[in-house]
Amino acid sequence: MTGILAVQGAFAEHAAVLDKLGAPWKLLRAAEDFDESIDRVILPGGESTTQGKLLHSTGLFEPIAAHIKAGKPVFGTCAGMILLAKKLDNDDNVYFGALDAVVRRNAYGRQLGSFQATADFGAADDPQRITDFPLVFIRGPYVVSVGPEATVETEVDGHVVGLRQGNILATAFHPELTDDTRIHELFLSL
C-alpha cells in the first residue's frame, strides 16, 4: 500500500491518480498512520519548509526516514524532491538527505513563473522510458548538480528536473496535476 504524506500540499491529487490506477493508498498524517501495510511512500508537492517542520511535529519523519534507508520505494514531487535531496544550494536545511543531488528551492521563481512543458522521462535505452510526458511546474525546484548515485531522468531547458536513484524517484514537476498516469505507474512498478 502507498502511504501519501498528508501534512500539507498536493496529497489529494496523488490519491486521485492512485484511485484511477486502482492502487491502494493511505494518508499519512501522524506516526500511527505509518504501519506495516505501507510498502511505498509519496512525498507530495507543497511548501518544503512547512512540510519539514510538520514531519517532525507529527512524528512521521523517523518512520519515513527508516523506510527510505531500507531501500523501499519513495516518490518525491516538487517539495518532495527538496525533502529527499542531500543538499540544497540556497537553504541550510537538509531533511531526508537520501537523493544524491544538490537542489535549488523555488528555482523557477514566483507563482507567476509557473509553466508547462513536455519531455521524455528516462534514458533512451530504458525499456521503461516515458515519451512526451506533460510537465507542470509551480514555483518548482531544479537540480543544480547530480552525484554518481543518481541518474538523470529528464531535463527542461538545460535543467535537470527528474532523477532516479534505486527505488527513489524525484521530480521537480507535478505529474499528479496531469491526466497522464505513466510516472505513477513507473513508481508503482519499483
Swiss-Prot record:
Involved pathway(s): Cofactor biosynthesis; pyridoxal 5'-phosphate biosynthesis
Signal peptide: none
GO CC, alphabetical: cytosol; glutaminase complex
PROSITE patterns: PDXT_SNO_1, PDXT_SNO_2
Gene label: pdxT
Assembly description: In the presence of PdxS, forms a dodecamer of heterodimers. Only shows activity in the heterodimer.
Top-level taxon of origin: Bacteria
Task of the protein: Catalyzes the hydrolysis of glutamine to glutamate and ammonia as part of the biosynthesis of pyridoxal 5'-phosphate. The resulting ammonia molecule is channeled to the active site of PdxS.
PANTHER family per UniProt: PYRIDOXAL 5'-PHOSPHATE SYNTHASE SUBUNIT SNO, PYRIDOXAL 5'-PHOSPHATE SYNTHASE SUBUNIT SNO1-RELATED
Keywords: Glutamine amidotransferase, Hydrolase, Lyase, Pyridoxal phosphate
Lineage per the UniProt record: Bacteria, Bacillati, Actinomycetota, Actinomycetes, Bifidobacteriales
GO MF, one annotated term: pyridoxal 5'-phosphate synthase (glutamine hydrolysing) activity
InterPro entries: Class_I_gatase-like (IPR029062), PdxT/SNO (IPR002161), PdxT/SNO_CS (IPR021196)
Residues annotated for L-glutamine binding in this entry: 46-48, 105, 138-139
This protein's name: Pyridoxal 5'-phosphate synthase subunit PdxT
Pfam families recorded: SNO
Any single GO BP term: pyridoxine metabolic process
